[in-house]
Curated annotation (Swiss-Prot):
The modification N6-(pyridoxal phosphate)lysine is found at residue 323. Homodimer. CDD domains: DOPA_deC_like. GO terms for biological process: carboxylic acid metabolic process. This is Acidic amino acid decarboxylase GADL1. It comes from the Eukaryota. Its cofactor is pyridoxal 5'-phosphate. It comes from Xenopus tropicalis.
Length: 511
């Protein structure tokens, strides 16, 4: 009877429906109850399949499938009509099953790994709120948390004041730095374009991240105007070579404007001598940028911050908390020593629909005109939440543990037959060869190195198809393919280090 009564009560609404272009506008058309149920069910799957299993070494790191087979397993086709609830849930389970578990204790493949639960919870919040961080009126909480975390990061650089912005990746942070340096020396270029500037040259090391070359291409500087400075056998920029390159550019009639040093190179984990480079930059009045995307987190360790001695003299720094600090991709900051508003002057477009100057609050909190983006994620919030939860001490312990495990692995490599450590690790990068028994008595000529270069790729293929772990490899200079092992996650133990060496030996001894 009640149901019939409710039906009768809804009939007048249907009779009085408002239509525009044949579309009924009365009431929402989204079925909130089914959507809410889907979110609840997916959340349960996430907890059971990812969060609870994140540190379970009995789980596979990956469930390898060839691309064509994976396309069939995932049913990637989009149809005119939506799929049913249960099929969507199965799809979610398959996405998890066939994705790489980067939170697994034996994922050593990249410069990110592990799962920080506080950061993850913060990401749940920001994904649900779907904010865009450009004005205080639409993102009050996230504007303030970004400001707070930037101030703290600036403090760790040793600056009394500064500015900054969170960007979508260390590559973009490096591009910001190049653009700021160019604007400082050639401010007319913003309005008049490249024709108003002389031939500009920037300098970086042979071991730099490839984003420096991309920045030159993207900003119209040109890749031929990136002068790569020689490094020593540990991968560190040689200051004398930098001086030579600057003199060379000047003799060519070019205008040097920026030097980019690296604190934590991608392959070797090397740290450039920042103080010596800063001296040269001051001598020639060049912008000094430090790409500390990987190594910047060492600043939080009293024991290891000396790796970045001299960083306080930089004009700008790129630092990615999503790497060693596990804040979750993406979480990347560009920090600038200038506090005069250079970031805003360089990038502002003064969009009047966003950045009205007669708002009812302090418009200094509207940070969007500092950014090259309009819509921008609340990436700082997850780092803020994690830092609040763990404190500086907790983050320092993570770094110290990761580097202690790295030293342990290096020491074990030196003890084992068939393993060769290529460089003593300076950070969390351990580079080594595994030499199968059949190679150990061979003469090391061209044929040896040709065959030996296939060892690491073959072992990598086997570990991926087995799903036991992931460790990266690459050639470097005169060295053929070798393993590059990265330690980050606090879930990693000494037993995992032993497992890596045992597993490589198991997978490669027959080669």
């Amino acid at each position: 009877h009640d149901i019939d009564k409710n039906k009768q009560e809804t009939r007048p609404m249907k009779r009085n429906a408002v239509l525009v272009d044949g579309v009924v506008l009365n009431g929402p058309i989204i079925d909130s109850s089914s959507g809410e149920k889907f979110v609840e069910d997916v959340y349960r799957i996430l907890m059971n399949e990812l969060v609870y299993k994140a540190s379970d070494i009995n789980q596979k790191v990956c469930e390898w499938q060839e691309p064509e087979q994976l396309k069939k397993l995932l049913d990637l086709n989009i149809k005119d009509n939506g799929e049913p609830h249960e099929k969507l849930l199965q799809l979610c389970k398959n996405v998890i099953k066939y994705s790489v578990k980067t939170s697994h204790p034996r994922f050593f493949n990249q410069l990110y790994a592990g799962m920080d639960h506080y950061s993850l919870a913060a990401r749940f919040i920001t994904e649900a709120l779907n904010p865009s961080v450009y004005t205080y009126e639409v993102s009050p909480v996230f504007i303030l948390t970004e400001e707070a975390i930037l101030k703290k990061m600036i403090e760790f650089l040793g600056w009394k004041e500064g500015d900054g912005i969170f960007s979508p990746g260390g590559s973009v942070s490096n591009m910001y730095a190049v653009n700021l340096a160019r604007y400082k020396y050639c401010p007319d270029i913003k309005q008049k374009g490249l024709s108003s500037a002389p031939r500009l040259v920037m300098f970086t090391s042979e071991e730099c991240h490839y984003s420096m070359k991309k920045a030159a291409a993207f900003l119209g500087i040109g890749t031929e105007n990136v002068y790569f400075v020689k490094t020593d056998d540990r991968g560190k920029m040689i200051p004398e070579e930098l001086e030579n390159q600057i003199q060379r550019a000047k003799k060519e009639g070019a205008v040097p404007f920026l030097v980019s040093a690296t604190s934590g190179t991608t392959v070797l984990g090397a740290f450039d001598p920042l103080d010596d480079i800063a001296n040269i930059c001051e001598k020639h009045k060049l912008w000094f940028h430090v790409d500390a995307s990987w190594g910047g987190s060492a600043l939080m360790s009293q024991k290891y911050r000396k790796r970045l001695h001299g960083i306080h003299r930089a004009d700008s720094v790129a630092w990615n908390p999503h790497k060693m600090l596990m804040a979750g991709i993406q979480c990347c900051a560009l920090l600038v020593r200038d506090n005069s508003g250079l970031l805003k002057r360089c990038h502002s477009a003064e969009a009047t629909y966003l950045f009205q100057q007669d708002k009812f609050y302090d418009v200094q909190y509207d940070t969007g005109d500092k950014s090259i983006q309009c819509s921008r994620r609340a990436d700082a919030f997850k780092f803020w939440m994690m830092w609040k939860a763990l404190g500086t001490t907790g983050l320092e312990e993570r770094i110290n543990r990761a580097l202690a495990l790295t030293r342990y692995l290096a020491s074990e490599i030196k003890k084992r037959d068939g393993f060769e450590l290529l460089w003593e690790p300076e950070y969390a990068n351990t580079c080594f060869w595994y030499i199968p028994p059949s190679f150990r008595n061979m003469e090391k000529g061209p044929e040896y190195w040709r065959k030996f270069s296939n060892v690491a790729p073959t072992i990598k293929e086997r570990m991926m198809k087995k799903g036991s772990m992931m460790v990266g490899y690459q050639p470097h200079r005169d060295k053929v393919n070798f393993f590059r092992h990265i330690v980050i996650s606090p879930q990693v133990s000494r037993e995992d280090m032993d497992f890596v060496l045992d597993e490589i030996e198991r997978l490669g001894r027959d080669l």
